[in-house]
Amino acid sequence: MLKIEVADTFFKRLRGLIGRNNLPQGCGLLIAPCNSIHMFFMKFDIDAVFIDKNFTIKKIVENVKTWTGLAFCFGAWAVVEFSAGEASRLNLVVGQKLEVEINT
């Protein structure tokens, strides 16, 4: 089960992962609502996993680069950001439902 932190307020979504050096394996940040991301001010590359309200994966964008990366998914409700390489390591695929443990 994936451990997920939630960014569901304006300021939490605005900050996202800015200022962090990494995310541990199996951990991610859920930004909701959100269907696009940028990588300005980020310190590490990420995998962006766009999901619907049922946590079904709609799109996976791997290895989004710091400062230059952008990713979006029309129709997505949210995005879960993981450290780069996690989507592959976890064998995530489009259509799969994410099983998550929400950390508050």
Model-derived regions, located:
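Compact, glycine-rich, soluble single-domain proteins
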Residues: 1-104
